[in-house]
A protein has these predicted regions:
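Extreme N-terminal leader/targeting segments of oxidoreductases
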Residues: 1-38, 53-61, 423-428
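Glycine-rich Rossmann-fold phosphate-binding loop(s) that bind the pyrophosphate
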Residues: 42-48, 68
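Active-site substrate-recognition segment that forms the wall
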Residues: 52-56, 81-83, 112-120, 213-221, ...
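Glycine-rich FAD pyrophosphate-binding loop
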Residues: 55-77
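Dinucleotide-binding Rossmann-like beta1-alpha1 core, especially the glycine-rich loop
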Residues: 80-162, 285, 323-324
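Short beta-strand to alpha-helix junction loop
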Residues: 94-97, 124-133, 177-196, 206, ...
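Helical element adjacent to the flavin cofactor pocket in flavoenzyme catalytic cores
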Residues: 176-235, 243
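C-terminal catalytic lobe of FAD-dependent flavoproteins
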Residues: 325-428
């Protein structure tokens, strides 16, 4: 079932002071066919973006996106919608940088307001060691031509006047990495925009449809079994987010080094604009930004145990309140309005697993993004579509192969604002 939003409303009739409106579906509802050129498991941003670029760039329009619930049900609709390219490794930075530049173009192309707000990101350091780590991070970004700089506490205060830079807080601010190209978007707008663009090009989106199995003959994908019937296809993309490792293990016999950890987020009541940048602290385990509606959107570190629960806990809400009011004392007394949780599919090196045709011909994987999935979705979808259409992995994606774990080529990506829980192992 499609969503209805104000950008697709027609005035039907005006009678006196009454205005009658007609709502149009952003995307249609298609019958499940018995044969598709490609099947994508997961109606999140990576799946929708790949479907869109398969149709747009490669003429592969017989594509089915299979979603067990509704599109955007998983991480696509539960994240805090922050985008940035301030990672540290040479493999990650070019991908995120190119992805950051794609967002404004995508909004024009889809003819859909994704509400991109280029507000910049501030990542705080609370010790000399933390400041040295940020110097390395800034140098890595600048080496690749990505705008980033190191700020002292007074410069941080100029950008965020409400920030407490005194030494009275538990962890005083020593400085910050400022990343001007970063910002925020509206995550549901991105989901709807990509769905609209994909279906306009002929892609079929099947919500409320569960994948039960993947058929393989002679080490080649031949079909997908769903609760609505069998689909014959030569290509399958596993883009199921938190459930991707389970699908890969149970349906394909390929175990992935992924832990699934709940990650929680909250929003406050609307406030007058005062926070013009995304702020984050790895020591306080908090990141926050102010939405266009005035709410403070904030997240924390992940739960310290593997789980598929999406329930929130009082402990994390209390932690967020304490951390936010230390960094931004003006938030004392502000109410949290709601909280939610999503699933982060974490790998040992905090980098994704992107692979295809290595184990089974026609089986592709785009998973293990943790809480970086939103930032990378459109650009990864573009390259993933190229991979599936040509059967040749683009250079940009080659470092993320599953074989890097067997070959001991872990990325070591540590440029994240939060810690990520327990020791990792080969789990499903």
């Amino acid at each position: 079932m499609g969503f209805f939003v104000t950008s697709s409303i027609d005035i039907v009739k005006v009678r006196g002071d009454l205005v009658f409106w007609k709502y149009k579906r952003l995307w249609g509802k298609a019958q499940l066919k018995s044969c598709y050129d490609a099947v994508i498991i997961g109606g999140g941003l990576h799946g929708l973006a790949t479907a869109y670029f398969l149709a747009r760039d490669h003429g592969i329009k017989e594509v089915a996106v299979i979603e067990k619930h509704y599109i955007g049900f998983g991480g696509a609709g539960r994240n805090t919608a922050i985008v940035r390219a301030n990672q540290r490794t040479k493999e990650n930075l070019p991908l995120y940088d190119e992805g950051l530049k794609l967002w404004p173009k995508l909004a024009d192309e889809l003819d859909f307001n994704l509400m991109f707000f280029n507000c910049g990101n501030l990542n705080f350091a609370h010790s000399e060691a933390g400041l040295n780590a940020l110097r390395l991070q800034v140098a890595s970004a600048q080496f690749l031509g990505i705008k980033s700089e190191l700020l002292d506490p007074k410069q941080c205060k100029e950008l965020v006047p409400g920030l407490d830079i005194s030494d009275r807080i538990r962890y005083p601010i020593f400085g910050a990495m400022y990343h001007p190209p970063g910002g925020t978007l509206r995550h549901d707008a991105v989901v709807w925009g990509l769905a609209k663009g994909a279906t306009r090009l002929g892609v079929h989106i099947h919500q409320g449809t569960e994948v039960l199995g993947i058929g393989v003959e002679d080490q080649r994908v031949v079909s997908v079994e769903t609760d609505k019937g069998k689909i014959y296809t030569p290509r399958v993309l596993n883009a199921a987010g938190g459930y991707s490792a389970r699908i890969s293990s149970e349906m394909m016999g390929i175990r992935l080094p992924i832990h699934v950890l709940p990650i929680q987020a909250m929003v406050t009541e609307p406030l007058k604009p005062f926070l013009n940048h995304v702020v984050s602290s790895g020591v306080y385990h908090v990141y926050a930004n102010q939405s266009l509606k005035g709410e403070i959107v904030t997240g924390s570190h992940m739960d310290p145990w593997p789980s598929y629960t999406t329930q929130t806990t009082a402990h994390y809400i209390k932690h967020q309140a304490e951390a936010l009011t230390e960094l931004l004392p003006c938030l004392k007394g502000v109410k949290f309005m709601r909280a939610w949780a999503g699933l982060a599919d974490m790998t040992p090196d905090m980098a994704p697993i992107i692979d295809g045709n290595d184990h089974i011909q026609g089986y592709y994987m785009d998973c293990g993004w943790g809480y970086f999935g939103f930032k990378s979705a459109p650009i990864t979808g573009k390259y993933m579509a190229q991979f599936m259409a040509t059967e040749n992995c683009p250079e940009m994606l080659k470092p993320f192969t599953l074989r890097r774990y067997e070959e001991h080529r872990l990325m070591g990506e540590t440029a994240s604002p939060v810690n990520y829980g327990p020791e990792f192992g080969w789990v499903t």
